[in-house]
Amino acid sequence: MPKTISVRVTTMDAELEFAIQPNTTGKQLFDQVVKTIGLREVWFFGLQYQDTKGFSTWLKLNKKVTAQDVRKESPLLFKFRAKFYPEDVSEELIQDITQRLFFLQVKEGILNDDIYCPPETAVLLASYAVQSKYGDFNKEVHKSGYLAGDKLLPQRVLEQHKLNKDQWEERIQVWHEEHRGMLREDAVLEYLKIAQDLEMYGVNYFSIKNKKGSELWLGVDALGLNIYEQNDRLTPKIGFPWSEIRNISFNDKKFVIKPIDKKAPDFVFYAPRLRINKRILALCMGNHELYMRRRKPDTIEVQQMKAQAREEKHQKQMERAMLENEKKKREMAEKEKEKIEREKEELMERLKQIEEQTKKAQQELEEQTRRALELEQERKRAQSEAEKLAKERQEAEEAKEALLQASRDQKKTQEQLALEMAELTARISQLEMARQKKESEAVEWQQKAQMVQEDLEKTRAELKTAMSTPHVAEPAENEQDEQDENGAEASADLRADAMAKDRSEEERTTEAEKNERVQKHLKALTSELANARDESKKTANDMIHAENMRLGRDKYKTLRQIRQGNTKQRIDEFESM
C-alpha cells in the first residue's frame, strides 16, 4: 500500500490535518476540506501554497497535489482562502460559514493594511467585529480591558492618533453598545457590507506596463479590469467590465485582451514574468464566470441553499426572540426582587424607627409618671401640713378662748392677759400666713400635677398609635482558502450572452450612502477622531482618500466615471498613460 502524505490546511479560524495518497488530485483534497468545514459555496475558494521559489500559488484542482511545485516538507502546507470575491455580500454569500470566512479574511487584510481603510471606518468596523465576537455589551461581563487581547485597528490608524489603548477601547466600546440586539451573524454581514465599499476590497493588483513602457497597476476584481497609476491604487483611471471582453490570451510576458467591440483595438499590456500572466488569466476566467453566473437565474442548488439559509436565519431569530423574552422576564423578576428587597429594607428601617420612637415615648411616659408621683406626694405633704396648721390654729383659737374664759374666770391681771393675748394673736397671724402659703403651694402643685397628667395622657395616646402600626412581614421572594514556466502562451474565450448587458453594478451606492445609521456613525467618528489626529503622520493613501472625499467620489461613482466612452476611447486612453 502506497505511503500516505501528511497535509495541513489552515483556514481563517482552524487547522485541519489530512493524510492523502500520492495520486490525490487538488480537487480531491479541496473537496475533503470543504466537506470537513461544511462549506457549500465552494466557487469562491481555493487552496494556496508557497512554491519552491517562495511565490504564493493556487493549487490546480485538475492535477495531482504531488505533481505541483509544492515545497516538499512534512506536512505539506496549504491555506484555504477566498480566491474570488462577490459583487454584493448580502445578495451572494448564503451560508454563515461563507460569510465568516470572508469576514476573517477581509478583516485580516484591513488590519495588515493590505486593504486601505480610513480611521473612522476602521473604528466602526472594529465595533462590528467586537459584536460578532462578544455579542451584546454587558457591563457586568465586559469590564475595563476586555478588548486588550484583540487586534482591532490597523497599526497606521493607531500611530496617527494621540490616543492610548484605554481611550481606543472606550471609543470602540461606545459603538459596541450601539449594536445591542444584533445577532453575531448579522454583525459579520454588516462588517462585510461596509468593507466591500472600500476601494481596495476584492482587488488583485498586478504590476504591468503599456506599450509606452509606463509603470501601471492592473486591478482584477469581480466587476472587471481596472487600470491604476503607479502611485495611486485607490482610484482607478480606466475600467473595462467583463461584459466588454471577448477573449483573453498571453504569449510569454505579453497579455492581450480582445474586446467584444470589433472596431476597438486589442488591449495589450506586459507583465514582468510569465507566471504573472498565468495568474491574471486564471483570475480573469474565474471572475468572468462568476460575473456571468450572477446575471442568470439561480441554479436549483443555490435556490435550495438560500431557502435553507432563510429557514436557519428565521429559526435563529425565533430563538433569539425567545431568549430575549426570557431575558426580559428574568430581568423583570430581578427588578421585582430588588424592589421587594428595597421595600423590605425600607419597612424594616421604618419599623426600627417606630420602635425607637416607641421606646423613647415609653421612657418619657415613665419619666412623666415618676414626676407625677413626686408631685402628688408633694401635694399630699403640703396638704397634710396645711391641715396640721389648720388644726394648730384651731387649737390656738380654742386656747385663746380658754384664756379669755380663764381671764374672766380667774381674773388675771390685765397686763398678763394682754401679754398672752398679744402673743397668741401674733402666733395666730403667723399660722394664718403659713397656712395661706401652704394652700398656695398646694394649688401650685395641683396645677403642675394636672399638666403632667395631660402630658401623660397625650404620650399614652401617641404610644397607643405607634404600638397599633401593623408589624411588616418579610415579602416572599420571586422564584423565579502558475508556477509552471513552461507553456508560454494560453488563451481563453469569455462567452457572453444577453445577460452580459446587465451592468447594474454601475448603479450601486455605498452602504454609508443608503444606510442613514452607518452614515451618522461615520460622521460622528470623523468628528470625534479629528481632535486626536496627528496630521504629520498622514500616508499617501490618506491624502488620496481625503481628496476623493473632497471631490465627492466613492468606489461606485468612480466606476461609472472610468467606464464612460466606448471601448476604443478607453483603450486609447490606456495607451497614452
Curated annotation (Swiss-Prot):
Reported impact of residue 558 to D: Phosphomimetic mutant
FERM domain span: 2-295
Alphabetized GO MF terms: actin binding; cell adhesion molecule binding; double-stranded RNA binding; enzyme binding; protein kinase binding; signaling receptor binding; structural constituent of cytoskeleton
Summary of activators and inhibitors of this protein: A head-to-tail association, of the N-terminal and C-terminal halves results in a closed conformation (inactive form) which is incapable of actin or membrane-binding.
Pfam families cross-referenced by the UniProt entry: ERM_C, ERM_helical, FERM_C, FERM_M, FERM_N
Motif [IL]-x-C-x-x-[DE] motif, residue range(s) on this chain: 115-120
Bilayer disposition of the protein: Peripheral membrane protein
S-nitrosocysteine: residues bearing it: 117
Biased amino acid composition, Acidic residues: 476-487
Modification sites for N6-acetyllysine: 79, 139, 165
Function: Ezrin-radixin-moesin (ERM) family protein that connects the actin cytoskeleton to the plasma membrane and thereby regulates the structure and function of specific domains of the cell cortex. Tethers actin filaments by oscillating between a resting and an activated state providing transient interactions between moesin and the actin cytoskeleton. Once phosphorylated on its C-terminal threonine, moesin is activated leading to interaction with F-actin and cytoskeletal rearrangement.
Domain notes: The [IL]-x-C-x-x-[DE] motif is a proposed target motif for cysteine S-nitrosylation mediated by the iNOS-S100A8/A9 transnitrosylase complex.
Listed name of the protein: Moesin
Source organism (scientific name): Homo sapiens
